[in-house]
Amino acid sequence: MPTMIIGTSLIGMGIAYLNVYMPSFVTAYFPSNIGLYTSVYTFSMMFGVALFNVITAPIMVWAGWWSMLIVLAITPLLALIIWLFLMPHLSEEIHEPQVEVKKEAMSNDQIWVNKKAWAFLIMFGSQSILNYTFTAWMPSLMAYHQVGSGVIGIIMAAFSLIGLPITVLLPQLLVKWGRLGKLFLVGSAGVTGLIASGMLFFQNTSSTIFWMIESLLLGYAIGLFFMFVVTMFAIKTSNPYRTAQLSGMAQAGGYFIAALGPVTYGWAFGLNPTGNLQNVAFVVAITLATIMGVIIVKTKKI
């Protein structure tokens, strides 16, 4: 058990580090192609999640649980080798004047007391709490309603896969579209998410169609909220150092909020699996994410 906790903590730190700094890397090395390269790295991230959701069970059945751990160890090792190979070529891509920009960014008001930055934190936390709560507890909720285990697997895979086209299209749309276009995207996610949250009040069914629609609608809303806020880290900041500050602040606070979701939902689920308390929480989280998205669109720069 101790080694499992230590290993999980190390994995979490590695993921958190990359999540925070990838938006600033994109801003630093590809300032004129933020949309394209945000699409590239987020697509690969979500594709990896979907792929491993599919292959984990077959590999464990075929070769044992330890074989999956080997695969998981080799994957970051390959990423490290590629990164070490590319490192000597990266420093030439950042212009020297950015050293002065760093001093300016660090001397600005602290990001944690910047009211505009809190919109990013709340939006990131809202979509994260939705995502982690859904993935942790929806299989149990569907099983409670007598949905077959095979069907549950397909529905959860659909939840993951719906985000892939969003990762390809949304960042470039956010770069190209003006304020009205961005507001439309946020509004579409909000409306879709509220419809999905409203459906949970009528969840007493084992219908595959019902739960598939629920999964796709909520997957679209969460995926769009996530891609929106990650892309806006770069768009709404003037340099990579400020991007790193904003990304770190929003994700640190956001993931802290997200950690509360599965625990509190589990407590409510234990009291009443079909209770309205958890359904109202979904509505509140969607509403908060939508409102914060509108505020972010109207924010010029941080």
Model-derived regions, located:
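Cytoplasmic helix-loop-helix junction between adjacent transmembrane helices
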Residues: 7-44
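Intracellular juxtamembrane helix-capping segments at the cytosolic ends
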Residues: 17-30, 224-238
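Helix-loop-helix hairpin linking two adjacent transmembrane segments in secondary transporters
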Residues: 32-33, 37-91, 137
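Flexible cytoplasmic inter-helical loops of multi-pass small-molecule transporters
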Residues: 84-109
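Extracytoplasmic gate region of multi-pass secondary transporters
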Residues: 115-167
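Helix-to-loop junctions at the C-terminal end of transmembrane segments
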Residues: 166-180, 269
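C-terminal transmembrane helical hairpin of 12-TM major facilitator-type secondary transporters
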Residues: 180-232
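A late C-terminal transmembrane helix in Major Facilitator Superfamily
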Residues: 235-282
